[in-house]
């Protein structure tokens, strides 16, 4: 009974965003999925055994994809038409951990977030978060095959739990400078780091933080899960914590999306429950992405479906469908991002990463409008 009351409180808080979801839903747009790389043979165009449970994916303005391989502790590079094109990058671990578990990653175009090794110092080209509670930077001029540890919060304790669990990563700028934002799923906050990798603030949605569907102990609440910078604002997904606050608990309606400014102020509740099911990947579609052009797309890890929302109102518009009118469902869906018009593919093609078969395997692929 107590759990039911807590759930009702959450629903009441987000009642207004929920109403237009059903009323505004459209039939999903038609799209074609193409499997590009997998760790398994005969599953995609190319095979790469390093691609196990890939999460985040990012690219430079004209470069290839950088993909975080959670299952192998690596980051691998792919173009839109080929398998790995450069040596894999090893993500560092904290003490006592054998293999890193990278999650979100971002491309860094700034001169900040400098890393150093053997008297060589350069700004990170790519930055990686991990479930081990670390953040690392990579620049081939510092080390061609290893990222450099910059943040280690693996031993930090809070509310009876030890070790940050970073699920997502975003980079955003404000008048105060350039900052990294990491979703710490274990502690239920978004952590903000300055240009020198110093932790300067943390924030969350106080409504969700004070309403936990499973009272515990320990209490299981909705915590920041995925994160993406869209139009200079931070879009943050929330998923339900498991008992040890490490993994999500999937299920229909288990998800929210909020929008924050770079100072951590909640701007609005963007999307709530409905078709959300442990949402993680987020992207803003371009003007030539078919039915869902210019809309925000959010991928569910829980059921592999991709939801589309009006970018202004957050109204649910439908889910991406294949040519037969069936909802596209990608088992273990994680990252979503559009190409760059260069080595990372067409700008109107949505690329994805997924850890299918309960995260035991990996898939990197593309979805384009028919």
Residue ranges, per PLM feature:
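Bacterial N-terminal signal peptides that target proteins for export
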Residues: 1-11
């Amino acid at each position: 009974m107590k759990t039911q009351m807590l759930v009702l409180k959450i629903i009441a808080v987000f009642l207004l965003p929920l109403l237009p979801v059903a009323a505004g839903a459209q039939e999903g747009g038609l799209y074609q999925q193409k499997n590009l790389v997998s760790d398994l043979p005969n599953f995609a165009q190319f095979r790469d055994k390093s691609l196990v449970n890939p999460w985040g994916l990012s690219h430079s303005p004209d470069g290839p994809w950088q993909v975080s391989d959670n299952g192998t502790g690596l980051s691998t590079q792919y173009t839109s038409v080929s398998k790995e094109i450069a040596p894999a990058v090893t993500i560092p671990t904290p003490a006592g951990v054998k293999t890193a578990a990278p999650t979100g990653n971002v491309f860094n175009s700034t001169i900040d977030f400098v890393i150093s090794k053997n008297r060589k110092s350069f700004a990170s080209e790519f930055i990686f978060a991990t479930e081990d509670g670390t953040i690392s930077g990579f620049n081939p001029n510092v080390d061609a095959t290893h990222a450099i540890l910059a943040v280690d919060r693996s031993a930090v304790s809070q509310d009876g739990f030890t070790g940050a669990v970073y699920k997502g990563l975003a980079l955003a700028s404000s008048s105060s400078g350039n900052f990294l934002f990491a979703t710490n799923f274990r502690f239920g906050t978004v952590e903000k780091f300055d240009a020198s990798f110093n932790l300067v603030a943390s924030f969350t949605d106080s409504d969700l933080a004070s309403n936990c569907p499973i009272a515990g102990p320990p209490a299981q609440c909705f915590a920041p899960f995925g994160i993406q910078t869209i139009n200079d604002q931070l879009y943050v997904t929330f998923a339900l914590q498991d008992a040890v606050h490490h993994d999500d608990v999937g299920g229909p309606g288990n998800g929210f999306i909020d929008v924050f400014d770079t100072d951590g102020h909640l701007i609005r509740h963007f999307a709530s429950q409905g078709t959300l099911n442990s949402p993680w990947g987020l992207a803003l579609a371009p003007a030539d992405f078919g039915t869902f052009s210019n809309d925000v797309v959010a991928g569910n890890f829980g059921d592999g479906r991709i939801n589309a929302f009006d970018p202004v109102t957050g109204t649910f518009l439908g889910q991406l469908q294949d040519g037969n009118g069936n909802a596209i469902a990608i088992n273990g869906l994680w990252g979503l991002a559009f190409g760059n018009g260069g080595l990372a593919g067409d700008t109107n093609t949505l690329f994805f990463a997924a850890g299918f078969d309960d995260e035991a395997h990996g898939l990197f692929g593309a979805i384009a409008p028919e």
